[in-house]
Amino acid sequence: KCDIIIHSAAMISIGFDAYDQVYEVNFVGTKNLLDASINKKVKKFIFISTVNAYDKKPIDQNFDEKRELVRKGNAYDMTKALAQELVTSTEEIETVSINPTSVLGKNDFKPSRLGKIIKGVHSGKLPFLVDGGLDVIDVEDLSKAIYSSISNGRDGESYLISGKFRSFKVIYEVITKYQDKKSRIFFFPRLMVELSLPLLSLFPIGLLKRAAEINGKFFPGLENMTKEAIENIINFPKHIDNSKAKKDLGLKISPLEKTIKDTIYE
């Protein structure tokens, strides 16, 4: 007998995947698993969503779980929002939605898209970044919050699992602490990036995907800098409120130095 389902499987798309394909995995897959959980009388269904399920604008105001779910945007954001709405509105079993920000830390074997960027900067193979930032959460802090939600997550509630907003310049300075020789890096100015982004929409998806793959061979991590990823970096909310997760789930935040070090070495 299974009492708890923690559903973390998803297709993370950054602009190159067809909407129908992402929808099939992120929404239909979640619905199928939720239906099966109800039929098998599972006690609690914990859905690992994302901060991207929420409407990010305005980015300079307090960002909490009362924000509207996103209704337009890229396939990943929209399908995760639809799945979260489905899960949290279910009445047949207890449900909880966990909404992490940008996850980094130990055992990033593949590595993840952000992990690859961190490791690319650390190795000196990625000599430039966008002048933006992200809210980083340590994978161990996230895991503890998910575990706590089994007992402490309230039915039908969503929880933002966030750390603190950090600019890529701050992240870069932390990375250099773990370099034998400090690498040089160029940050593309935000205004220049914002003016250039509309031009990417003029090119076919297939061509952009191939160009990204080629760039990634020379500069590891650069293949993940798609139009959607860059928009996320330059428009990431700066005031994500994790007080609800701290109160209900006992969320504690690790120092950024620990998270970056674990990403590089563990």
Name every feature range the model reports, one short phrase each.
Residues 53-55, 93-114:
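Flexible, glycine-rich beta-alpha linker
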